[in-house]
Swiss-Prot record:
Heterodimer of two noncovalently bound light and heavy chains. The keyword Transcription regulation does not apply. It catalyses: Preferential cleavage in B chain of insulin: 3-Asn-|-Gln-4, 13-Gly-|-Ala-14, and 26-Tyr-|-Thr-27. The lineage of its organism: Eukaryota, Fungi, Dikarya, Ascomycota, Pezizomycotina. It comes from Aspergillus niger. Keywords: Aspartyl protease, Cleavage on pair of basic residues, Disulfide bond, Hydrolase, Protease, Pyrrolidone carboxylic acid, Signal, Zymogen. This is Aspergillopepsin-2. Gene3D superfamilies: Peptidase G1.
Length: 282
């Protein structure tokens, strides 16, 4: 952004207001570059990073970091969904985030920044070795918001897409596709602006897929060694939610619903209807 040499006081104030977010956004990008921001499998609420393993026998489960819908089956090679980028604000969990009183979360960072992430993925629950995923982070601090598109092949870290701009209200389509258990692609399309970015994984990944899970998730992701303070995102609805298994397309109607529980409080409410998955902050 360029400014003229003569600035009014209001322009100076606007620039000053934007500065903290700019620094935080830069810090997040540097953290990604240093390998510090990543998603995780779903954790059991109140545990020290114990993975919640779904068995498909219950309609709803609670996790400390995942909300949304998870299909359990075999041969999932593609997952896609569309959502509108939400307005985001400070969450009710406070700047200390989740679980400052025990175990892994004792060292939760003190911060005024709140974030959440909407993504689609293959594996990560009943299959713990890998997650192929892509989505959008949305963050809030001091009245300012930012949105970043990313891709990840867990257990490696997440990496930003650099050639796409995302704003509140944009319609986004996210797709992951596995061409083998160690290769595939992640694509984010901004249907509002016409921009599209893809990252291709050509083997040499840190973990192989099992292709047993397909998911549409809003996550309280990890930065450094702790979960970020969870943002109030209103609601995110994945529409045209589809997964491909054995050449056939399936929707989320038979998925297990997951909601986020932290410190004894349920922070989300998830519902599935037809080909849509809605996650609401409560």
């Amino acid at each position: 952004m360029k400014f003229s040499t003569i600035l009014t006081g209001s322009l100076f104030a606007t620039a000053a207001l934007a500065a903290p977010l700019t620094e935080k956004r830069r810090a997040r990008k540097e953290a990604r570059a240093a390998g510090k921001r990543h998603s995780n499998p779903p954790y059991i609420p109140g545990s020290d990073k114990e993975i919640l393993k779904l068995n498909g026998t219950t309609n709803e489960e609670y996790s400390s970091n995942w909300a949304g819908a998870v299909l359990i089956g075999d041969g999932y090679t593609k997952v896609t969904g569309e959502f509108t980028v939400p307005s985001v604000s400070a969450g009710s969990s406070g700047s200390s985030g989740y679980g400052g009183g025990y175990g892994y979360w004792k060292n939760k960072r003190q911060s005024e920044e709140y974030c959440a992430s909407a993504w689609v993925g293959i594996d990560g629950d009943t299959c713990e070795t890998a997650i192929l995923q892509t989505g959008v982070d949305f963050c809030y601090e001091d009245g300012q918001t930012s949105y970043d598109a990313w891709y990840e092949w867990y257990p490696d870290y997440a990496y930003d897409f650099s050639d796409i701009t995302i704003s509140e209200g944009d319609s986004i389509k996210v797709t992951v596709e596995a061409t083998s258990k160690s290769s595939g692609s992640a694509t984010v399309e901004n249907l509002t602006t016409g921009q599209s970015v893809t990252h291709t994984f050509s083997g040499n990944v840190e973990g192989d897929l099992c292709e047993t899970n397909a998911e549409w998730i809003v996550e309280d992701f990890e930065s450094g060694d702790s979960l970020v303070a969870f943002a109030d995102f209103g609601s995110v609805t994945f529409t045209n939610a589809e997964a491909t298994s054995g050449g056939s397309t399936v929707g989320p109607s038979d998925a297990t619903v997951m909601d986020i529980e932290q410190d004894g409080s349920v922070l989300t409410e998830t519902s599935v209807s037809g080909d849509s998955v809605t996650v609401t902050y409560v």
